[in-house]
Amino acid sequence: MNQVEIYTDGACKGNPGPGGWGVLLRSGPTEKALFGGALGTTNNRMELMAVIEALSALQRPCAVTLYLDSEYVRKGITEWIHGWKAKGWRTAARQPVKNVDLWQRLDALVSTGGHRIEWRWVKGHSGDPGNERADALANRGVDQALGRGALASAE
């Protein structure tokens, strides 16, 4: 099983506002950077999109170490999602889960992708090189959403 390190980040200028997501994938000496953006979005939606786009980019089952600075996404996918699904995508307070469309996409990728994923939280803006790269890519996604380029790119 291929080993892959993934760093993801989301950014939003205003919340809601124009936002972007960034992904850095590493497998051995190979790196791939992805980014994209949207208007009228939130930071949490962009954090989720980064992880969705990262896992969607994997072409075969992998052993993934996924680094993210969003406790919302990490706890959501490792802890909260089980209760949400059992309650028909409602929270413990019986409210509809926010961003349910993205949570369902992420759940499908995690459940059916065949990946072994280790979710690792890193403190944002703390100097972690992979997280800093993902942050810079997310900000490029914001720029694209604001009309300074295409809406999704890979390099």
Curated annotation (Swiss-Prot):
This is Ribonuclease H. Mg(2+) 2 binds at D9, D135. Binds 1 Mg(2+) ion per subunit. May bind a second metal ion at a regulatory site, or after substrate binding. It is an enzyme of class 3 (hydrolase). GO terms for cellular component: cytoplasm. GO terms for biological process: DNA replication, removal of RNA primer. Endonuclease that specifically degrades the RNA of RNA-DNA hybrids. It comes from the Bacteria. Its cofactor is Mg(2+). CDD domains: RNase_HI_prokaryote_like. Monomer. It catalyses: Endonucleolytic cleavage to 5'-phosphomonoester. Residues 1-143 form the RNase H type-1 domain. Its EC number is 3.1.26.4. It comes from Verminephrobacter eiseniae (strain EF01-2). The gene is rnhA. Belongs to the RNase H family. Its main location: cytoplasm. The lineage of its organism: Bacteria, Pseudomonadati, Pseudomonadota, Betaproteobacteria, Burkholderiales.
